[in-house]
């Protein structure tokens, strides 16, 4: 009885034994793994070199001439603004402006670059809401050849925020889909939901700056043919500068 049990156990152990892999197959598998590791390393190095190469951009002589011309033009224009400001009068019925950057700023003066940065328009075809004040109007005059701006209505404000509204929370960009996030960051200003946020932007109050800075700049949609036919696309958009209430048409076009 004992011998039969022992025999059965030995048979089961033999069945459970892991089958041995032939030595030549192990060598092939090891060589294949080494080859894959080498290929992965080479691909990583090539990717790093490609990233390094992207930083090296050679400028043509025409680009330097164009940048020099832009800087001279900016200097003359800004000097004229200092001598004869011709500031726009503050409108009685409008307290909110929407500014869209529609031109590249390569080679422009440092003052223009700094003003663009203050307006948070670092990317082309991005837009921000700005409260209409003498100081902000002066900033808009400085960057006038590179942006277009006007007075949005409540419908445009609502559509922009509902479709493209985003906020930066803990260095992460998140869509405005949760009222809890809005209440957590803007509740101290009496803003607890998306409708409150839209109202505070459309009708600027004393906390407009804090609320508008909670919003990320709006990255507007550009037609597919814009990259191929930039001149034609800019003609469709219109010229830079002030356009009053016609900014609502542009918002609907790019939203």
From Swiss-Prot:
One of its GO terms (biological process) is blastocyst formation. The modification Phosphoserine is found at residue 63. It comes from the Eukaryota. GO terms for cellular component: cytosolic large ribosomal subunit; mitochondrion; nucleolus. Keywords: Phosphoprotein, Ribonucleoprotein, Ribosomal protein. GO terms for molecular function: RNA binding; structural constituent of ribosome. InterPro entries: Ribo_uL30_ferredoxin-like_sf (IPR036919), Ribosomal_uL30 (IPR039699), Ribosomal_uL30_CS (IPR018038), Ribosomal_uL30_euk (IPR005998), Ribosomal_uL30_euk_arc (IPR035808), Ribosomal_uL30_ferredoxin-like (IPR016082), Ribosomal_uL30_N_euk (IPR012988). Belongs to the universal ribosomal protein uL30 family. This is Ribosomal protein uL30-like. The lineage of its organism: Eukaryota, Metazoa, Chordata, Craniata, Vertebrata.
């Amino acid at each position: 009885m004992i011998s039969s049990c022992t025999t059965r156990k030995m048979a089961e152990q033999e069945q459970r034994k892991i089958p041995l892999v032939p030595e030549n197959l192990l060598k092939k598998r090891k060589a294949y793994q080494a080859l894959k590791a080498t290929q992965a390393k080479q691909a990583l190095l090539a990717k790093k070199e490609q990233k390094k190469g992207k930083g090296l951009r050679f400028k043509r002589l025409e680009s330097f001439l164009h940048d020099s011309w832009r800087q001279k033009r900016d200097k003359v224009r800004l000097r004229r603004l200092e001598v004869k400001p011709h500031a726009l009068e503050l409108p009685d019925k409008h307290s909110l402006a929407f500014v869209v950057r529609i031109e590249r700023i390569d080679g422009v003066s440092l003052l223009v670059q700094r003003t663009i940065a203050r307006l948070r328009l670092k990317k082309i075809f991005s837009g921000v809401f700005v409260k209409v004040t003498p100081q902000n109007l002066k900033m808009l005059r400085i960057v006038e050849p590179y942006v277009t701006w006007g007075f949005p209505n409540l419908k445009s404000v609502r559509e922009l925020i509902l479709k493209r509204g985003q906020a930066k929370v803990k260095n992460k960009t998140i869509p405005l889909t949760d009222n809890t996030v809005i209440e957590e960051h803007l509740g101290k200003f009496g803003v607890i939901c998306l409708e409150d946020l839209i109202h505070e932007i459309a009708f600027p109050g004393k906390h407009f700056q804090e609320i508008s800075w909670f919003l990320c700049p709006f990255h507007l949609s550009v037609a597919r043919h814009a990259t191929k036919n930039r001149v034609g696309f800019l003609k469709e958009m219109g010229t830079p500068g002030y356009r009053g209430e016609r900014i609502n048409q542009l918002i609907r076009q790019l939203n």
